[in-house]
Amino acid sequence: MAGAELRAALEQRLAALAIRTEVVEHPEVFTVEEMMPHIQHLKGAHSKNLFLKDKKKKGYWLVTVLHDRQINLNDLAKQLGVGSGNLRFADEAAMLEKLKVGQGCATPLALFCDDGDVKFVLDSAFLEGGHEKVYFHPMTNAATMGLSPEDFLTFVKNTGHDPIILNFDKN
């Protein structure tokens, strides 16, 4: 499926769950820094997404944190019980295979494409921060989609993923 078809499939899935969204179209962006000028007016929690690989078990992890978080992969690996030094950024081919999105498009909204190979880690600040909306790319890095934290969790669980919720403020 191409990007437009994947986005339409995502929108259909969200509609089937009666999840309302707000979408802002913007130029294609590849980093949080490029994205923020286009969406900083949107009130809520903006995301940074890391697609990682566990070098020992060959497992995949999608880690979604607040956009301004700095993540130490060794500390994260210890928290996840995979051992320090065992998490690496996965290559684009793996992301395309597992989530059907490429570089700059990593998003938890792509979890509906995963067959259960990707573990999902979510920053607890998305759920505990009192945010009206949480924002992610809708299968394209030329748009940003907002939905309520409750609806987001409903969507994630509907994909068959039980998020590992971590408090990154403790690090």
Curated annotation (Swiss-Prot):
One of its GO terms (molecular function) is aminoacyl-tRNA deacylase activity. It comes from the Eukaryota. InterPro entries: ProX/PRXD1, YbaK/aa-tRNA-synt-asso_dom_sf, YbaK/aa-tRNA-synth-assoc-dom. It holds the Pfam family tRNA_edit. Belongs to the PRORSD1 family. This is Prolyl-tRNA synthetase associated domain-containing protein 1. The lineage of its organism: Eukaryota, Metazoa, Chordata, Craniata, Vertebrata. The gene is PRORSD1.
